[in-house]
Structures are given as structure tokens and as C-alpha cells.
Amino acid sequence: MINKKISLGVLSILTAFSLQSVSYACTGFIIGKDLTKDGSLLXGRTEDLEPHHNKNFIVRLAKDNPAGEKWKDLSNGFEYPLPEHSYRYSAIPDVTPNKGVYDEAGFNECGVSMSATVSASANDAIQKIDPYVKNGLAESSMASVILPSVKTAREGVALIAKIVTEKGAAEGNIVTLADKDGIWYMEILSGHQYVAIKFPDDKYAVFPNTFYLGHVDFNDKENTIASEDVEKVAKKAKSYIEVDGKFHIAKSYNPPLNDANRSRSFSGIKSLDPDSKVTYKDSNYELLQSTDKTFSLEDAMKLQRNRFEGLDLKPLDQMALDGKGKPKSKKAVKGYAYPISNPNVMEAHIFQLKKDIPAELGGGVMWLSIGSPRNAPYLPYLGNISRTYEAYQEKSTQYNDKSWYWTVSHINDLVAAHPKPFGTKVIDEIKGLEKTWIAEQDKTTKEISDLVVSDPKAAQEKADKISLDRAEKTFKRLKAIEAKLVKEKPKNKKGLNRS
């Protein structure tokens, strides 16, 4: 068993980082199918909160619910009736359900995929008119209530809208839901206001923790779902803003753009399109971005691992500190910013959705990194799996050598603490594994897609076996990498190993 410790220096960096970024969590993205090299729709999110926060990956099986049974969120008191029958779905929950389940993302058996949420918050003027509701719908309940209940992405958006209208929202959030017909992007703006759009196939978007919707045609009922008073509330709050004579949602509902959202919006757009005209000084970044470039799954992975490569910025967690967790100089702070790939990332997921993949398989593949993908792999999972590897299910809140999350967390800590000796050795090997899996996945998906037509049970068993075998083999390799890093890490002046 490896004795896991974090050196004082690393702890100071992480502490300073956490204090400066306590309200910054998650970065989402969407790449429309017309902008991808293989015609797939790409969408995903990094889930950020804090270092050393265990995440599981599980499948919640289908079940019938007794009449009157309710979902109960122990973190804020929200309750909602369960459907008569709950569909099977995959989930990425926390391990402390009394503080919120946070199922976060997954496929359900009907082919609906969901990522929930990117947190955001309305400005003070809006909140005075339509405040958030303490026991309303929150991120902690979102996927757990929606995924087992809906057959289409639009149904999911409509159910969220119904709940927010009737019971209120506990917080501002951005949610994405997708199926074979495309992807919906939804902003829950205030206590009872929301706007959702069917995302265009020829656009891309990067969205950290602020609202992004500009002008939306509320009369386009086929592609828009919105609360009735979204404009009225902004006018009443006296925060209503028009651009080119039209109501601009983000400018009306947002507080001023903060540096962490600026840095991730800017670097995310530039990661995908270095020729984009956006600048670091922009006061607002529009949701719908255009480009003449096309993108691959690897580009999406690169986006979620972005640490300002090619830009005149350095990651905030690399600041020189004074020994007390504070920057040595304000001049240094000016050159540093908050990256998409930061120490607070707990997991990252990418949905790769294709028209020719049956809904029974989720309509695509979820590429999942439990733990930050900075030095950890994305593994592919189809939507029909019924089981996950045991290392994904360890519930410890501190280091556990049998846990996937804690193993990856330790590897990331070691590489971050010792960049000179370890360099890019780990991530280079990880990318090699991913390249192999990407090359193999189309063949695997085709075989299981063909099988599901004639024998759904056999298709599920095959998907389970392939994913379990891959996860087991990969976890053994991660344990070997971890052990090698521990053995090779530099020693301090007293000859003791530092972690």
C-alpha cells in the first residue's frame, strides 16, 4: 500500500488556488456535427470543485417505483415525485449523498445523454426580483431526476422547465441534453426563468460559469423553450439590455465577467480555433461561435486538458508563492490565469454522438476520465452497459489504493509536484492508449450495434465485457505508473521521499 502524502509546498499551492477559485466550477463545450471530421456531435464538461474529491462511475438500473415515492435531495430538501418506472442510466456521483448525490452525466436506456451542470449566477438586480429558491432544483438532483424519467432530450428540457416553473431553481445552471435528433443547451437563469435552444449543427461553444445566450427567437417553438417572463424580469430588475435592437439574455442576466470565466472562455475558443478574433480583453463572449475548421475527438480532449498552450498566459496553480499560500508579487499575478485544466477538476466527460449508433446504445460513446484528465485516460463507454469496474465504485473520502479516482489523483499530484523529472512521460503514454482505443472503437460499436438488433441482452453482455476488461487492464497500468512515480520521485535534503 502506498503511503499518500502531499508536500507542504503542493498543499500551499492547492490551498491558494482553491481560495482564489472557490466559486469557479466546470467548463462545458459543444461542437456541432457539421464541424467535426467524422460527422459526430461532440459535447462534454469538466466537473470542477476541489482537489481530492472522490467521484464514482456507476449504472443505476431500471426499476418500478411505488405510487407516491419521491426523489429527496438531502442537501437542500428538494423533493419530486418519481416516475412509475425509472429508466436505467449511467451516472458519475459523489460519495457523500447527504451533501448531494451529483449524478452529473450519463446515458439513459432510451438514448438520452445529459451533462449537468455548469454553475452560473444571475446578477444581484435579477436575484432581487426572482431569487433562487433554497429547496428548489439544484445540480445535486438534476441528472438523478431527469435521466430516469425521459425518452428524448426535448422531454428532458421540458421537464426541467416544468420543475423550475413549479418549484423554482436553487441556483443558476447550464445543462445540455442530447439524443439522435441533436443537442439542447439550457440556461436556468434565476429562480423561475430559463431559456433553452436546440444547438445549431454548424456552431461550436465553450461555456464556463456564466450565461452566454444572446438574442433568442422566442417565437421559434420548435427550437426554443423559454419561461414566459424572462424579458419581463430583466426589465423589472432594470438590467434589461438590447444589442442591435434585440433583447440580449446574457448581458441582461449576468454580473460583470470575472477573470476565471474570461480566461476559460478565451482559451477554450482559441484552443479549438487559434484564428478566432476573440481577445482576452473582451467584455462578453457569445455562445455561438463560427469557424471554417473541423474538429476531432482528440481536439475535444485537448480542449479539456488546456493549460494556455500557445497563449501568453500561465496557469494560476504555477504561481510563485511566499510560503504562506499567497503570490510573491502582484506582477506575477498579472501573468497568470485560471485554466480549463486545473487542480479542481474531479472528472471529465465527452459525448461522441453519431446518427448510425442505435438509441439502445445511447446513440454514441461517452469518453470518461475519472479524476483530472491532465495525467489520466479517457475510456470509451456505450450507453447500454449495466456494470462498471469495481475501482470506479470505491467510496472512500481519502486515499484508497483500490480506488480509480484516488489513484489518478495521486498520479496527478506527483507529476504536478515534480514537473522536471516527470515531464510529460505519463500523459504521453496515456495519449498513446487513447489513440489505440479511438482506432478500435468504431469496430466495437459496429459489432454491438449489429448485435443489439437481434439480441439486446447479448449486446449488453458484450459491451459490459469489453468495457470491464479494458478498465481492469488500464487500472493495473495506472497502479504501475503510480508505483513507478513514487519510487522515482526526488528526495528532500534529509533523504526522505517527498510526495
UniProtKB/Swiss-Prot annotation:
Keywords, alphabetical: Dipeptidase, Hydrolase, Protease
GO molecular function annotation: cysteine-type exopeptidase activity; dipeptidase activity
Catalytic activity: an L-aminoacyl-L-amino acid + H2O = 2 an L-alpha-amino acid
InterPro entries attached to this UniProt entry: C69_dipept_A-like (IPR047804), Peptidase_C69 (IPR005322)
A GO biological process held by the record: proteolysis
Covalent S-S links between cysteines: none
Catalytic residues as annotated in Swiss-Prot or TrEMBL: C26
Pfam families for the chain: Peptidase_C69
EC numbers for this chain: 3.4.13.19
NCBIfam families: C69_fam_dipept
Sequence similarity: Belongs to the peptidase C69 family.
Identification of the protein by name: Probable dipeptidase B
Source organism per UniProt: Streptococcus pyogenes serotype M6 (strain ATCC BAA-946 / MGAS10394)
